[in-house]
UniProtKB/Swiss-Prot annotation:
Coiled coil: none annotated. Its EC number is 1.17.7.3. InterPro entries: Dihydropteroate_synth-like_sf (IPR011005), IspG_atypical (IPR017178), IspG_bac-typ (IPR004588), NO2/SO3_Rdtase_4Fe4S_sf (IPR045854). Converts 2C-methyl-D-erythritol 2,4-cyclodiphosphate (ME-2,4cPP) into 1-hydroxy-2-methyl-2-(E)-butenyl 4-diphosphate. SUPFAM superfamilies: Nitrite and sulphite reductase 4Fe-4S domain-like. Transmembrane segments: none annotated. The keyword Transport does not apply. It catalyses: (2E)-4-hydroxy-3-methylbut-2-enyl diphosphate + oxidized [flavodoxin] + H2O + 2 H(+) = 2-C-methyl-D-erythritol 2,4-cyclic diphosphate + reduced [flavodoxin]. GO terms for molecular function: 4 iron, 4 sulfur cluster binding; 4-hydroxy-3-methylbut-2-en-1-yl diphosphate synthase activity (ferredoxin); 4-hydroxy-3-methylbut-2-enyl-diphosphate synthase activity (flavodoxin); iron ion binding. This is 4-hydroxy-3-methylbut-2-en-1-yl diphosphate synthase (flavodoxin). [4Fe-4S] cluster binds at residues 508, 511, 543, 550. Belongs to the IspG family.
Length: 602
């Protein structure tokens, strides 16, 4: 048996950046970050939430600073934390108001700014065209407005995060580069150049998006551009507006897990809608399941290559209806399941309504069964609705045997199963077979000892990393819980932008700017709209500071505009404003009807 040369990962080398009493960078552990949801002016409530976050394992906490009232509140918050001997670093989140950053840096450990709105106007999609002269003048204006903050941070020894968000790029950058990954990268680099010119290096970067595919590509591109310039600045990872529940965990794990597996990332946050308390255990599980493996794998020559299907192999779907140009999901059924399950219950678990024969949108394309069970009555019943494959009809490749991967017997099979034990071995497999057009079914099983959240994170990180690069032809999931298999399989396919079978929801985690009960409203909107067809994306955003921009690719948006009032959006355009919140959900339904996407629940 050949010993595989696994495509390993190791931490990208980054500078140490001091934030209060702790350091961030590749020579230090990856830190967990969160953000308070209390009003920053509620000093007591904010301090209580910060203390609760620290007790759970949060390393860095951020608060929103809209203006001078919040600046003064930060002074009191920091004093209270010092009095209670709480050393967790405090970060101020700044949008649209540079003077707040200049003042608050005196009392916090780090400031976060958004290049899309710190100096320039946020893009309002007016179609304005910048000449080269106007663009150069705008860069000079950026230098003049941004340099005072850089100078003060440098003088006081305070850190800064330059946090780019997809969808909230400045008008100038969007006009030149579009709302693209390139635009995100150049937005960050413009601010980085000011910092470098002023010899200020306590800088961290982030490139967030609610779309994991965009987010991963943006971080990879920025890391490449920074390292080309020998600027070894740390990265903070996050999928912004990931949403709530299992879907939010899946999105975060697909995006963050992929990058951690490539050695990128020095701090992380899982931006889940609801209490920030719920984010910390997910972050801990995510780090546990990715970094421990990476440490064992060791160092590689090409630690964070910008992977693509073109580099690592092509994706060919199995040419069997209904899989033409569709990435299929298969469920493995064991002989024990087939022999012991009640037929009606098993069909329902697969998403088949035994009364009407209707198929749920999250029903898999097919099942894989032992050949000996193919003629059983239950399999015959399943075959009326789904494709059925005999497990023995295609080779199941050993992930540790490279000779088997390339053998004549393997390559002559109609398709193969490849058992994915880790991301880097799978990438090695596709790299060696990059000229093969043979369909590959990625096979996944789960450790039965994992908790539900650990299982969600493990599968999302392993499968998501490969799907984002367009690898494989279909997925075979081998779990005891068939319903969980279906749910996770399609959520991961949706997070990787490969298939969309249900409505996708984008919702921010909430912060001190949030103007309504974000979790409750998000859940109600989900209940009202979850029956609508896949491909639709609905955003629920707590305020207008980032809401309109950061729901970049949503079809419809529900955004808090002022206390008790909601604005409704179609794409980037506000079409209904200042709707009383008690009427807003019904108005959203009416808007969906006006645009022809509404249908009544069955």
């Amino acid at each position: 048996m050949a010993t595989p040369c696994i495509q390993n990962a190791f931490r990208r080398k980054t500078l140490p950046v001091r934030i209060g009493d702790l350091f961030v960078g590749s020579e230090h552990s990856i830190k967990i970050q969160s953000m308070t949801t209390t009003a920053t002016t509620d000093v007591d409530g904010t301090v209580r939430q910060i203390c609760a976050l620290q007790e759970l394992g949060c390393d860095i906490v951020r608060v929103t600073v809209q203006g001078l009232r919040e600046v003064h509140a930060c002074e009191h918050i920091k004093d209270r934390l010092i009095q209670q001997n709480i050393s967790i670093p405090l970060v101020a989140d700044i949008h649209f108001f540079p003077q707040a950053a200049i003042h608050v840096v005196d009392c916090v450990d780090k400031v976060r700014i958004n290049p899309g709105n710190y100096v320039d106007k946020r893009n309002m999609f007016t179609g304005k065209i910048y000449s080269d002269e106007q663009y150069a003048h705008s860069l000079e204006h950026l230098m003049n407005k941004f340099s005072p903050l850089v100078e003060k941070c440098k003088r006081l020894g305070k850190a800064m995060r330059i946090g780019v968000n997809h969808g909230s790029l400045s008008e100038r950058v969007t006009q030149r580069y579009g709302n693209t990954i390139e635009g995100m990268v150049y937005s960050a680099l413009e601010y980085a150049e000011v910092c470098v010119a002023m010899d200020y290096h306590d800088v961290i970067f982030s490139m967030k998006s609610s779309n994991p595919k965009v987010m991963v590509a943006a971080y990879r591109s920025l890391a490449y551009e920074l390292d080309q310039r020998e600027w070894s600045y740390p990265l903070h990872l996050g999928v912004t507006e990931a949403g709530s529940g299992t879907a939010g965990i899946v999105k975060s794990a697909v995006g963050i897990g992929t990058l951690l597996s490539e050695g990128l990332g020095d701090t992380i946050r899982c931006s889940l809608t609801g209490s920030p308390i719920n984010e910390i255990p997910i972050c801990i599980d995510l780090l546990k399941q990715t970094t421990e493996l990476s440490e064992r794998w060791g160092e590689a020559d090409n630690p964070f290559a910008i992977h693509s299907s073109k580099q690592l192999g092509t994706r060919n779907t199995l040419n069997t209806p209904p899989w033409d140009n569709v990435y299929g999901l298969l469920i493995n059924l064991t002989d024990v399941q087939l022999l012991t399950a009640e037929p009606i219950e098993l069909l329902q678990c697969l998403g088949i309504d035994t009364t009407t024969g209707k198929i749920d949108p999250t029903t898999p394309e097919g099942v894989v069964v032992p050949k000996a069970m193919r003629s059983s009555p239950i399999v015959s019943e399943i075959e009326k609705h789904l494709l059925v494959f005999n497990k023995e009809d295609a080779p199941i490749l050993n992930p540790m045997n490279e000779e088997e991967w390339l053998s004549e017997e393997t390559l002559s099979a109609p398709f193969v199963y490849f058992e994915v034990t880790d991301i880097h071995t799978a990438r090695r497999f596709f790299s060696l077979r990059q000229h093969s057009t043979q369909p590959v079914c990625l096979s996944f099983s789960l450790d039965p000892h994992l908790s539900k959240n650990e299982a969600i994170i493990d599968l999302s990180a392993r499968l998501g990393a490969l799907l984002l690069d367009g690898l494989g032809s279909c997925v075979l999931l081998d779990f005891v819980d068939i319903k969980l298999s279906r749910t996770l399989g399609f959520l991961i396919l949706q997070s990787a932008n490969i298939r969309s079978v249900t409505v996708e929801y984008v919702s921010c985690p909430g912060c001190g700017r949030t103007l309504f009960d974000l979790l409750a409203v998000s859940q109600r909107i989900r209940e009202r709209t979850k029956h609508l067809p896949g491909g639709l994306k609905i955003a629920v955003m707590g305020c207008i500071v980032n809401g309109p921009g950061e729901m970049a690719d949503a079809d419809f948006g529900y955004v808090g505009s002022k206390p008790g009032m909601i604005d409704l959006y179609v794409k980037h355009k506000c079409v209904k404003s200042c709707i009383p919140i008690e009427n807003a959900e019904e108005e959203l339904v009416q808007l969906l009807k006006e645009h022809g996407v509404w249908k009544e629940p069955e």
